[in-house]
Amino acid sequence: MSEFWLCFNCCIAEQPQPKRRRRIDRSMIGEPTNFVHTAHVGSGDLFSGMNSVSSIQNQMQSKGGYGGGMPANVQMQLVDTKAG
C-alpha cells in the first residue's frame, strides 16, 4: 500500500509576520521647532516649598503661551528619599 499526500494551500492561512518597530537613531531626529525656553527648574527648586512652585508657575505664565489652561487646586505630599 502506498501513501499519497496532497497539500491544499488554499486551506492553510499564512501567519502574518509580527511588525517590527523601526529603530530610531540620532540621525533621524531633527532640531526642535518653535522652542521657547521660559524657565529653568532645578531639583532643589521644588524641595524649597509650595511658594517656590507658585513663583515658578507665575514666571512661566508671564512669558506667554500658557493662557489656555484652567486653574486647579493641587495638593502634593513631599517624600524625602535620602539614601542613608
UniProtKB/Swiss-Prot annotation:
GO BP annotations listed: phagocytosis; regulation of cell shape; regulation of Rho protein signal transduction; regulation of signal transduction
Keywords noted in UniProt: Cell membrane, Cell projection, Cell shape, Cytoplasm, Cytoskeleton, Lipoprotein, Membrane, Palmitate, Phagocytosis, Phosphoprotein
Subcellular location: Cytoplasm, Cytoskeleton; Cell membrane; Cell projection, Phagocytic cup
Gene Ontology MF, one: signaling adaptor activity
Coiled-coil portions: none
Membrane topology: Lipid-anchor
General function of this protein: Probably involved in the organization of the actin cytoskeleton by acting downstream of CDC42, inducing actin filament assembly. Alters CDC42-induced cell shape changes. In activated T-cells, may play a role in CDC42-mediated F-actin accumulation at the immunological synapse. May play a role in early contractile events in phagocytosis in macrophages.
Miscellaneous comment text of the record: CDC42SE2 is mapped in the genomic region associated with schizophrenia.
Family designation: Belongs to the CDC42SE/SPEC family.
UniProt remark on domains: The CRIB domain mediates interaction with CDC42.
Quaternary structure and interacting proteins, as annotated: Interacts with CDC42 (in GTP-bound form). Interacts weakly with RAC1 and not at all with RHOA.
Protein name in UniProt: CDC42 small effector protein 2
